[in-house]
Amino acid sequence: MPLSSMAMRKVGDRYEHVGQADFSRLRYMMICGCGFPNSQHNFEPAVAQFKQCFPRNHTIITIPESPMFNAPEAAVVTEPRLALVKQAGSQYAQSGEIDGELLHEIASPMIPEDQYAAIVNGGM
């Protein structure tokens, strides 16, 4: 069953379909990882699409170097990062928000970008 009807209304400078029910209490979260060494110029399309689909009540977490979570030898850097993600989850569960500094820290590289690229390229 569709969540919205064919009817439209203008909200700000855009049009959106009228919902079949009141979904204003819902919150939306995107957690997106990638295999690149940083968040710049890698997540923008996914973030833009998510914001178009869910223009209000959204939280976005981006995690570069995410394949490292599958490498046991990277635990020295991935376990502390996973602890930050769990902390963010606790904040979100309690208040519906995540501290901006915490989001920034989660989105930062776990190791230097050049080192990550060298590992991926088989240079280490």
Where are each of the predicted segments found?
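Glycine-rich phosphate/pyrophosphate-binding loop and the adjoining helix
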Residues: 40, 54-124
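Helix-loop-strand module that forms the ligand-binding subsite of alpha/beta enzymes
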Residues: 1-56
